[in-house]
A protein has these predicted regions:
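N-terminal Rossmann-like NAD(P)+-binding domain of SDR-like oxidoreductases, especially those catalyzing
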Residues: 1-150
C-alpha cells in the first residue's frame, strides 16, 4: 500500500538509504533536513537511482513553526525520524545543545504529527542507550544505562 512518509534527517547516511528503499517501494517521500551533517547531493543521487522524485524541505526540527507547516502541508501517513545530533563526545561537551535538538526537536515533531492525526513513527535510536555493560545482540526489552547526554 502506497504511503506518504515524512523523513526527518533524510539527507544523512541512514536517512538517504531509507529514502532510497521507500521510493523503490513506490511511497511518496518528503525529506525535512537542515543539512548540518548531510548534503542534498545524497538525495539527488537517490532520485537518479530510483528515477523518482521526492520532496525536500530545508528546515530544522528545533523550529516548531516551520516543522509544523511542512507536516501540515504534506499530511503524512507515517514519520521516520533520523534528525538529531549523534557524537557522544560532543554531547558531553555540549549537553544542552544535544537536549535542545534531540529532545525538544523530537517533541516538536510529535506535536506537529498530533495536529494532523499522524500516529505512526519510527525513531532511529542508538545502541549507546544500553551502556557499556551490555554485550550485543541488544534487544529493546533490555534495561537502559546511558553513559552520555547523547
Amino acid at each position: 500500500m502506497k504511503k506518504k512518509i515524512f523523513v526527518t534527517g533524510g539527507a544523512g547516511y541512514i536517512g538517504s538509504h531509507v529514502c532510497l528503499e521507500l521510493l523503490r517501494e513506490n511511497h511518496d517521500v518528503m525529506v525535512y533536513d537542515n543539512l548540518t551533517n548531510s548534503c542534498y547531493e545524497a538525495l539527488r543521487r537517490v532520485e537518479l537511482i530510483t528515477n523518482r522524485k521526492l520532496s525536500f524541505v530545508l528546515g530544522d526540527i528545533k523550529n516548531e513553526s516551520d516543522l509544523g507547516d511542512a507536516i501540515y502541508d504534506f499530511k503524512p501517513d507515517s514519520v521516520m525520524h533520523f534528525a538529531g545530533l549523534k557524537a557522544v563526545a560532543q554531547s558531553v561537551l555540549h549537553p544542552l545543545q544535544y537536549y535542545d535538538v534531540n529532545v525538544c526537536g523530537s517533541i516538536n515533531l510529535l506535536k506537529a504529527m498530533d495536529k494532523v492525526d499522524c500516529t505512526e513513527i519510527i525513531f532511529s535510536s542508538s545502541a549507546t542507550v544500553y551502556g557499556e555493560l551490555n554485550d550485543p545482540p541488544f534487544r529493546e526489552i533490555m534495561p537502559v544505562n546511558p553513559v552520555s547526554p547523547y
